[in-house]
């Protein structure tokens, strides 16, 4: 994240167009699947609500939309990435790398790999690659609930059993917005960063969804599902 050029401003319209540009540049063909995690899931909702007729399906991964009642009881904090910070050495910067929200992970080598590829050399030391303007807290000000309700293609939700952001109550509420034919898949033992701490379970969940969609263009599934974990 951060290897591409930075923009003067960011919004969901721009991000949706850039998702479409990536699909075209990668030559993914007609009706590709779009899969987005966390904030990327919100932008998946946006592109699927605006251009759903061009997609084969959209998979939202642990992107929380809570009911007004749950939000009142447990309001979500929207962290900002903060200002640019310079570290004297690569190792000093890497030691500060954290998942957001913080969580334990049984696969620290994956976290370290991401951290190593999230840094770049600057004139005065080492800095994170991301643009703080792109990652500011105001990016959560989009009407994502409306995007989810307006999704114009097959959609599914994957969430972690132990996620700090998407509870089963949250998943149930999102299911009500998506409709009864949208699969909801819970990955056992996974937290918010599903693909890091339970990568095999996450892949199993994705395969289950995408294989079902590809086998039967009209099959959207129904009801909550639970991914199995290979031993």
Model-predicted segments: where are they?
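Catalytic histidine-centered segment of alpha/beta-hydrolase-like enzymes
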Residues: 187-203
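Conserved catalytic-core motifs of eukaryotic protein kinase domains, centered on the activation segment
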Residues: 2-9, 69-72, 168-169
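Core-facing hydrophobic residues within beta-strands of well-ordered domains
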Residues: 29, 54-56, 181-182, 190
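Conserved serine/cysteine hydrolase catalytic core
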Residues: 119-177, 183-186
């Amino acid at each position: 994240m951060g290897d591409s050029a930075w923009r003067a401003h960011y919004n969901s319209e721009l991000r949706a167009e850039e998702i479409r540009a990536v699909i075209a540049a990668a030559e993914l063909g007609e009706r590709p699947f779009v899969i987005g995690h966390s904030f990327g899931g919100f932008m998946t909702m946006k592109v699927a609500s605006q251009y759903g007729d061009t997609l084969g399906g959209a998979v939202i991964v642990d992107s929380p939309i809570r009911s007004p009642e749950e939000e009142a009881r447990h309001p979500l904090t929207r962290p900002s990435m903060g200002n640019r910070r310079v570290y004297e050495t690569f190792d000093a910067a890497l030691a500060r790398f954290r998942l957001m929200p913080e969580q334990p992970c049984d696969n620290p080598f994956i976290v370290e790999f991401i951290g190593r590829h999230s840094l770049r050399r600057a004139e005065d030391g080492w800095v994170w690659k991301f643009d703080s303007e792109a990652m500011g807290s105001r990016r959560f000000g989009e009407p994502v609930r409306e995007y989810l309700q307006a999704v114009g293609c097959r959609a599914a939700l994957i969430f972690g059993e132990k996620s700090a952001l998407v509870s089963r109550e949250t998943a149930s509420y999102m299911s009500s917005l998506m409709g009864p034919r949208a699969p909801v898949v819970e990955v056992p033992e996974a937290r918010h960063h599903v693909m890091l701490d339970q990568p095999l379970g996450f892949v199993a969940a994705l395969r289950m969804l995408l294989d079902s969609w590809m086998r039967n263009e009209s099959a959207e599934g129904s009801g909550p599902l639970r991914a199995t974990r290979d031993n």
